[in-house]
Amino acid sequence: HALTPSTRAVYINSPNNPTGWTLGATDQQAILAHCRRHGIWIVADDAYERLYFEGAGVAAAAPSFLDLAEPDDRIVSTNTFSKTWLMTGWRLGWIVAPPELVPDLGKLIEYNTSCTPVFIQRAGVVAVNEGDAVIAHTADRLRRARDFLQARLQRLPGIEAVAAPGAMYA
């Protein structure tokens, strides 16, 4: 096991970049239980959360530690508008974290991002309020591209192609 007594945090990117691998809810429950017992933080990179192909309906959300979280859990979830809403390069996102981390996270953000331009902030509001159709279209287009590539790779001798359950990588 990679966890040792000195482990302070576990970083999980699911759906994963670049494989599209997705950590299932059962495994998330086991990891969360272990982290609770040992006081280990979970840093969840949820950038591809809504680009998930295995759930019910188009653009279903991937399993998330936030779905399992209790108020006192040590979970930090990061997310971005870049992937889901196709706003790559605009550097707009959000963090879900326990309230006691807010002052330190505020300092980190202040020193790394001096100011997100107002037009990008407004675009983010529109994306959240009106962007479900974009998400559904994007997820469907990516799923079809994955299926297309998967079918062609399976025809090649000696190639075993595993379908990615999420993200934007075939």
Functional labels for PLM-detected ranges:
Residues 125, 141-150, 160-170:
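Conserved glycine-rich beta-strand-loop-beta hairpin in the small C-terminal domain of fold type I
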Residues 28, 109, 139, 146:
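Short amphipathic alpha-helical/adjacent loop interface patches that line ligand
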Residues 67-68, 92-99, 129:
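Short beta-strand-to-turn element immediately C-terminal to the catalytic PLP-Schiff-base lysine
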Residues 99, 116-138:
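Structural motif of enzymes handling amino- and sulfur-group chemistry
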Residues 1-9, 18-41, 48-87, 100:
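Active-site pre-lysine segment of PLP-dependent enzymes
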Residues 70, 100-119:
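Active-site C-terminal subdomain of aminotransferase-like
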Residues 108, 140-141, 152-154:
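Conserved N-terminal phosphate-binding loop of PLP-dependent enzymes in the Aspartate aminotransferase
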